[in-house]
Amino acid sequence: MKDWLDEIHWNADGLVPAIAQDHETGRVLMMAWMNREALALTASENRAIYWSRSRGKLWRKGEESGHVQKLHELRLDCDADVVILMVEQVGGIACHTGRESCFYRVFENGAWKTIDPVLKDPDAIYEHAGHHHE
């Protein structure tokens, strides 16, 4: 029997784009990358675990900020090359800037305009971690 992970069309780097959406509102919270291990762990632990390309290691969402993403549903697109995680965003903040969503800028009159408020100062979110999160 074919492993469910084998059905995914991983890119040349062995990664797949992963979009996190609020399971109640449908709002897109963020996009990150997953390798095979990250996706397998996400499914088994029922929480979002991504692959940090900049750090070259697993990134357990919320491990520093406390803003864990609890998995409610996992979806695969028609080309099997993008996954969507329907999540409960603990703390209501997905972005390292302290906003609900990483998509807080809108294109308006030829420029990017910030429209979402900072819900919590990033320095306060990461003060115990001792460094800035990606």
From Swiss-Prot:
Keywords: Amino-acid biosynthesis, Cytoplasm, Histidine biosynthesis, Hydrolase, Magnesium, Metal-binding, Zinc
Predominant place of localization: cytoplasm
Coiled-coil segments: none
Cofactor binding mode and count: Binds 1 Mg(2+) ion per subunit. Binds 1 zinc ion per subunit.
Subcellular location: Cytoplasm
Record-listed Mg(2+) binding positions: 77, 79, 81
Keyword Signal annotated: no
Cofactor or coenzyme needed: Mg(2+); Zn(2+)
Job description of the protein: Catalyzes the hydrolysis of the adenine ring of phosphoribosyl-AMP.
Top enzyme category: hydrolase
Annotated protein name in UniProt: Phosphoribosyl-AMP cyclohydrolase
Keyword Cytoplasm part of the UniProt annotation: yes
Gene Ontology MF term list: magnesium ion binding; phosphoribosyl-AMP cyclohydrolase activity; zinc ion binding
Residues that coordinate or bind Zn(2+): 78, 95, 102
Complex and partners: Homodimer.
Pfam families per UniProt: PRA-CH
Cellular component terms per the entry's GO annotation: cytoplasm
Recorded catalytic activity of this chain's protein: 1-(5-phospho-beta-D-ribosyl)-5'-AMP + H2O = 1-(5-phospho-beta-D-ribosyl)-5-[(5-phospho-beta-D-ribosylamino)methylideneamino]imidazole-4-carboxamide
EC code(s) of this entry: 3.5.4.19
Family in the record: Belongs to the PRA-CH family.
GO biological process, one term: L-histidine biosynthetic process
Record pathway: Amino-acid biosynthesis; L-histidine biosynthesis; L-histidine from 5-phospho-alpha-D-ribose 1-diphosphate: step 3/9
